[in-house]
C-alpha cells in the first residue's frame, strides 16, 4: 500500500479512456484475473467475500455468470482446504482474516451461493458448509439473545473499529439463519433462534423508532446500521426505510456524496490505523457503502437514487477511474502513507444502478 502511495504521488492514479460506462466496463474486465474477481486493480488485488457478495447481483445482471461461478469455486476450494471461511484470499490461494473472524464472511458466501443458483456447488460442499454454519453458531451467536456475543471484537465491514454487539454483525446472523434454510443446509438456528425470532430481536434491540442504532449500547446513527438491515432484506417496511434515509440525511452522511459511516471521527479504531490512515473509516466517504445505500434508496425513492447515481458518474468521469473512498469534502482520500485504491469492482453496482 505504501509503495502504491509513492507511485500515485509520482504518477497519479491510472486513468481510463472513455465515458463513465466505458471506464466501468474496463475496470470490471480488469478485475477478472482468470481465476476470480478481485476487489480492485490496485493494492486490493485480492478476493474479499464481502465485496464479492455485494457485487454478485450486479455481476450476474451484467452477464458474468461463468466468472461468478468460477470465483465461488475458487473460494470454496481454498476455504474447504483450509477448513475455514476467511475474509480474504490471496492471489496464490491463501486464506486469511482481516483482522479476525468476521460474521459477514459466511453470510455473504451463503447469500452468493443462493442468488447465483449454484446448487451443484452447494451439494458438493454441503458437509463443509454445514460444519462452518455450526462453527459460526458456536463462535458468534449468544444463545441468550440471538445476537452476536458481547465483549468480542469481530472483524466487520468496519474492520479497523472496535465494536461490541453491532447492528451490522447481528444482521449477518439473521442472513446465515435464513440462507442456511433456503439452501437446504442443516441449520442449528431452528432449535433456538429462528430467522423470524432473530429478526424480531434485531428490531427490539436496535430500532429506535426513527433509525437503527449502531450498537446495542449506543444510539449513534451510522451508515452501515441503516443500510444493511434493508439491503439484506431482513426488513422491507417502506416507512422504516424512509425514516432511516431521513436520519442519514439529517446527519449529512450522504453529503457531498454517499456514504459516510458517521458524521464525526470516532475514537474506537485500532491504534496502527490512526497512524497510517487517520479517518479511514470515520467520516470519510465509502463508495461500496454508498452504492448499497443507493440500492436501498431506489426501493422507495428512485428520483433521489438517480441523483446519487449522477453524483458518482461525475466522480468517475472526473478521475477517469472508480475510487475506493473520499475525504469528507469529496476529494480522493489520502494520507502520508495511504492513497485511495482505484479500479474497484464495486463499479459493477453503479453500472446497474445507472439504468434506474
Residues covered by each model-derived region:
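Generic long, charged, amphipathic alpha-helical segments
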Residues: 262-283
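Catalytic cores of carbohydrate-active enzymes
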Residues: 18, 44, 82-88, 144-155, ...
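Low-complexity, Ser/Thr/Pro/Gly-enriched N-terminal "stalk/linker" regions
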Residues: 1-47, 69-70, 74, 83-84, ...
Amino acid at each position: 500500500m505504501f509503495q502504491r502511495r509513492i507511485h500515485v504521488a509520482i504518477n497519479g492514479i491510472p486513468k481510463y479512456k472513455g465515458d463513465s460506462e466505458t471506464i466501468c466496463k474496463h475496470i470490471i474486465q480488469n478485475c477478472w484475473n482468470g481465476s476470480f474477481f478481485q476487489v480492485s486493480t490496485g493494492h486490493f488485488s485480492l478476493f474479499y467475500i464481502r465485496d464479492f457478495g455485494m457485487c454478485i447481483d450486479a455481476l450476474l445482471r451484467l452477464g458474468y455468470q461463468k466468472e461468478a461461478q468460477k470465483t465461488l469455486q475458487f473460494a470454496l476450494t481454498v476455504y474447504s482446504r483450509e477448513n475455514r471461511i476467511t475474509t480474504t484470499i490471496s492471489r496464490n490461494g491463501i486464506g486469511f482474516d482481516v483482522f479476525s473472524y468476521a460474521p459477514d464472511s459466511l453470510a455473504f458466501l451463503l447469500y452468493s451461493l443462493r442468488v447465483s443458483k449454484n446448487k451443484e456447488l452447494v451439494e458438493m460442499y454441503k458437509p463443509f458448509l454445514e460444519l462452518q454454519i455450526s462453527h459460526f453458531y458456536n463462535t458468534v451467536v449468544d444463545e441468550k439473545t440471538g445476537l452476536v456475543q458481547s465483549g468480542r471484537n469481530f472483524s466487520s465491514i468496519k474492520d479497523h473499529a472496535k465494536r461490541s454487539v453491532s447492528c451490522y454483525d447481528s444482521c449477518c446472523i439473521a442472513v446465515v439463519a435464513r440462507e442456511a434454510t433456503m439452501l437446504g443446509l442443516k441449520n442449528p438456528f431452528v432449535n433456538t433462534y429462528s430467522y423470524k425470532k432473530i429478526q424480531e430481536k434485531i428490531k427490539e434491540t436496535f430500532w429506535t423508532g426513527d433509525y437503527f442504532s449502531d450498537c446495542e449500547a449506543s444510539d449513534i446513527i451510522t451508515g452501515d446500521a441503516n443500510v444493511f438491515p434493508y439491503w439484506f432484506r431482513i426488513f422491507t417496511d417502506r416507512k422504516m426505510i424512509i425514516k432511516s434515509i431521513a436520519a442519514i440525511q439529517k446527519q449529512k452522511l450522504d453529503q457531498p456524496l454517499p456514504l459516510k459511516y458517521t458524521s464525526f471521527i470516532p475514537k474506537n479504531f485500532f491504534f496502527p490505523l490512526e497512524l497510517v490512515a487517520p479517518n479511514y473509516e470515520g467520516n470519510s466517504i465509502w463508495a461500496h457503502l454508498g452504492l448499497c445505500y443507493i440500492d436501498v434508496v431506489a426501493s422507495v425513492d428512485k428520483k433521489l437514487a438517480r441523483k446519487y447515481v449522477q453524483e458518482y458518474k461525475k466522480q468517475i468521469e472526473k478521475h477517469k477511474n472508480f475510487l475506493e473512498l473520499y475525504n469528507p469534502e469529496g476529494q480522493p482520500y489520502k494520507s502520508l502513507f495511504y492513497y485511495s485504491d482505484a479500479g474497484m469492482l464495486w463499479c459493477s453496482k453503479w453500472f446497474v444502478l445507472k439504468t434506474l
